[in-house]
Amino acid sequence: MKASILKAGPRGIARASRIILRGGVVAFPTETFYGLGADAGNIQALEKVFRAKGREEHKPLLLLLADRTWISGLVKEIPMVAEGLMENFWPGPLTLIFEASPHLPLLLTGGTGKVGLRISSHPVAQALVQKVGQAITGTSANLSGQPSASLVAEVFRGLGGEIDAILDGGQTAGGLGSTVLDVTGERPRIIRRGAIPGSQLASFLGKKVDFFP
């Protein structure tokens, strides 16, 4: 199998959404790097993402949403601290980690009981998730341990034989990936440094933000 290259217009986005809803995996541009989209509720599709990336199954996959109202069925609760963060930093490169709904597949959460969510500010990513009509995976479109991809050629070189399609949105901004912030504890913790600095989050929250590890 070789991935189809789809133009990131209405027709290509519609085709990509159909591929995802049929259990396929599609690479698409975000405001940082290319991501891999699959149906978050389809176990076979999730397994395909793990195989394509060579990713260890204990590592969870983050999800992309089109709207904050989609959160309710994915998490146990929405902490008050998360409300302000979503209001100010979504859409954008901030992934928030919540206590996962027990209905989510274990493969998605990596058995951690938590799930990472964000809304991308990239118009193609937004349009794709909206067209699919439900949460999709948003993990980076690269082999595990390799640099993230900001060009279609890089995605194709690493994953072209393992995924179904690539939505060609041109070169992405690159830089740093999304900042990953765990909001499940008493004090927010940055799990992964990224495009939004910890100092900016701490300033907004008016409290210290822990770093882990």
Predicted features, each with a name:
Residues 1-213:
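Active-site-adjacent structural elements in enzyme catalytic cores
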